[in-house]
């Protein structure tokens, strides 16, 4: 085996490691969202605190993936699609780390809400969380499989969670107007809804970057998601 062939195999192995690490981090972040919402719905402070404690694992993985990306850039000087893949990996981990932080924020609000009587049945927020988690999962699947169509589907679904947020906002405003003693609880629920909306935004960011990685075209800041690229 000559040196070039050995180097190419090592490079391919590092690219594979990068993909696996990003998937692992994405799976952990998805679990963090799931546990945060369970802590809210089940009024389980212990689950919320355990989720907050696990955030350091997400942060550590963020650093590890950054190191892999920077090593690939420095040692192999990739070009074209590989360069886009590695720089996208750097950006994806930033979004995943922020989603992890948002899961912590949800837990903090849930612990506060758990100290008071439940304001309303939890129907809207678990549904929003399910949409956000699905968007995140699909964006990571699109990354691994270089699936542009799936990435575009994620971008389109961002409107769904925006509509659910607006619907919940109107309902909670009615609660606050009719019963001022509910204001604090309603505001905390609104915060959680906005957190979930931000998770969906981060999933959309990931999906947009995948389109750029595969096609070399940016769809960011377009008024409408294109039917194809």
Range-by-range predicted roles:
Residues 1-229:
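Cytosolic, long alpha-helical scaffolding segments
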